[in-house]
Amino acid sequence: MAAVTPALIKELRERTGVGMGKCKEALEEANGDMELAIANLRKAGMASAVKKEGRETKEGMIGTAENEKTIAIVEVNAETDFVVKNERFKEFLENIAREVANTNPSSLDAFLQQKYSKESSLTVDQYRATIVQTIGENIQIKRIMTLQKSPERSFGIYSHLGGKIVTMVEITGSNQEEALAKDIAMHIAATAPDYLSPEKIPQEIITSEKDIAKGQIQGKPANIVDKIVEGKINAFYDTNCLVRQKYIKDDSLSITDLVNQRSKVVGKELAVTNFIRWNVGQ
């Protein structure tokens, strides 16, 4: 009997979409023979899922869910935009987002292997495989994320282009600033900043940008070169750092200015401390 290794189990799961436990059982029954294990899974009624698992999933939708303690963000992919618009697909996305919010899994792999709360005889991944059979396309849960609520944090979530882009902003200092956080989330959907602030940029990126700037300047005195480079780096910050960007609804304000204005109004020290921008397929 060939050894049933974790790598073999993972390969069978990737080829079939069947849960890890069932893959292990199938391989053990087949004495480690991959093709026989696949054949046995087909005989067990999972043939359609097996046939579709290898297809590329380029389309998809990002969904969110929340409860009193947790916010969940989930991306689910399919083969065609036609299926993404299907109500059955949307229901699956909602169910998965709700499951993530309610169970707060440690990782995507752990989530796929845990029991599905609505049908405890299935793992989440087995539930996904049933949807593949029902809809007739390869469907994959690509990524998940959870965020924990607290008395001193506000979250704003914005969905753009029917869930093709979803953004989230976290503001610390109050749990009553959802409207401000959502406004900034809308801004992020349009401007796609790479970093929260200059302090969050890796040093190698800054060094590279300085080298590029210096390479664009020829024959200038050293003190002039330094000033020009400093100006170019500041322009890089203004373009790529959220807190330095001009607010899309009022370009007389930076995002920092916008938050500071609100801080004065509510009498609390507010700050943007985190943001997320998910784009389907990225």
UniProtKB/Swiss-Prot annotation:
Pfam families: EF_TS (PF00889). The keyword Ribonucleoprotein does not apply. CDD domains: UBA_EF-Ts (cd14275). It is found in: Cytoplasm. One of its GO terms (molecular function) is translation elongation factor activity. The keyword Cytoplasm applies. Keywords: Cytoplasm, Elongation factor, Protein biosynthesis. GO terms for cellular component: cytoplasm. Residues 80-83 are annotated as: Involved in Mg(2+) ion dislocation from EF-Tu. Associates with the EF-Tu.GDP complex and induces the exchange of GDP to GTP. It remains bound to the aminoacyl-tRNA.EF-Tu.GTP complex up to the GTP hydrolysis stage on the ribosome. Belongs to the EF-Ts family. This is Elongation factor Ts. It comes from Protochlamydia amoebophila (strain UWE25). The gene is tsf.
